[in-house]
């Protein structure tokens, strides 16, 4: 009857192949988008879309006469949130 350690060793041998997969998962093509013959990184488009959406959000907050504390931190966080959501949704 195998002991607990030998069962764990057998299980590790079965799943050891997945470790190299995680090590090379970042070795893919860079997500670049060709625009008029030049290649731009996809994070650049996420940042532009995020900036536009953040400015729209700012305009809505201003029109609603909402006074925010720590405005710089809030808008920076909104910019980062929108950029990550665009990246998650489209790339």
Swiss-Prot record:
It is a lipid-anchor; Multi-pass membrane protein. Residues 1-26 form the signal peptide. The keyword ATP-binding does not apply. A lipid is attached at residue 27 (S-diacylglycerol cysteine). Keywords: Cell membrane, Lipoprotein, Membrane, Palmitate, Signal, Transmembrane, Transmembrane helix. It is found in: Cell membrane; Membrane. A lipid is attached at residue 27 (N-palmitoyl cysteine). Its main location: membrane. It comes from the Bacteria. Disulfide bonds: none annotated. The chain crosses the membrane at residues 36-56, 70-90. GO terms for cellular component: plasma membrane. Belongs to the YtcA family. This is Uncharacterized protein YtcA. The gene is ytcA.
């Amino acid at each position: 009857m195998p002991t607990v350690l030998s069962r764990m060793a057998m299980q590790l041998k079965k799943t050891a192949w997945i470790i190299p997969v995680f090590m090379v998962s970042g070795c893919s093509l860079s997500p670049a988008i060709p625009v008029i013959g030049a290649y731009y990184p996809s994070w650049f488009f996420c940042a532009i879309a995020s900036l536009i959406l953040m400015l729209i959000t700012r305009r809505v907050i201003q029109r609603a006469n909402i006074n925010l504390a720590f405005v710089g931190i809030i808008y920076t966080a909104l910019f980062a949130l929108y950029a990550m959501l665009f990246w998650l949704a489209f790339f």
